[in-house]
Amino acid sequence: PRSTLFPYTPLFRSRSTEQLVDTLVLAKKLNGLLHHDIAVYSIEPVAADLHARFSALSRTYRYYVHTRKDPFLCAYSLELHYQLDYTLMNEAGRILMEYDDFGAFCKAGSDVKTTLCHVTHAQWYQTSPTTWYFEITANRFLRNMVRAVVGTLVEVGRGRMTLDDFRQVIEGKQRTQAGESMPAKALFLEDVSY
């Protein structure tokens, strides 16, 4: 998996559009204030009406797992103590793209207006003999959705759930039927497209 350097695009609004700012100086000053886990690499102007959340066309998340104890991965990847069938899990990922309603993967008790999302990509990738990541792209995500999807895919990969069962979970739209929500430490926002 990648190191702790993940690109992310926060957006800030200025009170004055007249004022020009030296972006290199601003980036340096922000880096002096930010926690060591966060870094600003560049600052670019955007349209005044752009909204960081609502103007996004798609988002891509990655969830990292590893199967051998590794002190360099433990903070940002989930260590699994069992073998998974990643081919079968990728088949389940393709099934995800056939659906638009993901109520089964929404955090219980969420007060969302809709559970509709358009998933355009869902696949596991192997980066070494013992490390993998799941990448998923959609126009939007529900709260806890990616972690619940990964937990359900792990059930498929362990042979505890068939592909037909996986379809029934999605179609049933009940969070209690899906797999467990995996720990947040291994989930990263990889990209936002505008």
Where do the protein language model's features map onto the residues?
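Structured-RNA-binding interfaces characteristic of tRNA pseudouridine synthases
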Residues: 12-194
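Single conserved hydrophobic/aromatic residue that forms the stacking wall/gate
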Residues: 1-10
